[in-house]
Amino acid sequence: MGNLFYFILAAFCEISGCYLFWLHFRSDKPALLLLPAAACLLVFAYLLTKIDTATAGRAYAVYGGIYIVCSLAWMYGIEKFSPDIWDYIGVGICLIGASVILFAPR
C-alpha cells in the first residue's frame, strides 16, 4: 500500500483517538471512551512506521500537511462545522510546505 493510504489512515486514527479524549474531558462523556482512544493512538503511531522514508522526521513533517486536511474533513463531516476561507488558505499553505519536503530532489 502507498504512503498516502498510510498517512490518511494514520490521520483518522489520531483524530479519532484525540476526539474521544475531547469528548470525555470536554463534553463529560464516559471514561470508557479512553480505552478506544488509546487504541486509536497506538494504531496511529504504528501506521507512521509504515511510511517509506529514511527518516522519521521527514515522515512526520509530510504527515502534518495530510493531518491538517483530514482535520478539516473531520470538522466538516463529524462535527458538522464548515471550514471558512482562512481554513482553506491555511491548509493550502501547509500542503505547499509538505509538498516541498516530500518532492524535493535529494
Swiss-Prot record:
Keywords: Cell inner membrane, Cell membrane, Membrane, Transmembrane, Transmembrane helix. It is found in: Cell inner membrane. The keyword Membrane applies. Coiled coil: none annotated. The chain crosses the membrane at residues 5-25, 31-51, 59-79, 85-105. InterPro entries: UPF0060 (IPR003844). Its main location: membrane. GO terms for cellular component: plasma membrane. The keyword Transmembrane helix applies. It is a multi-pass membrane protein. Belongs to the UPF0060 family. HAMAP family: UPF0060. This is UPF0060 membrane protein CHU_3331.
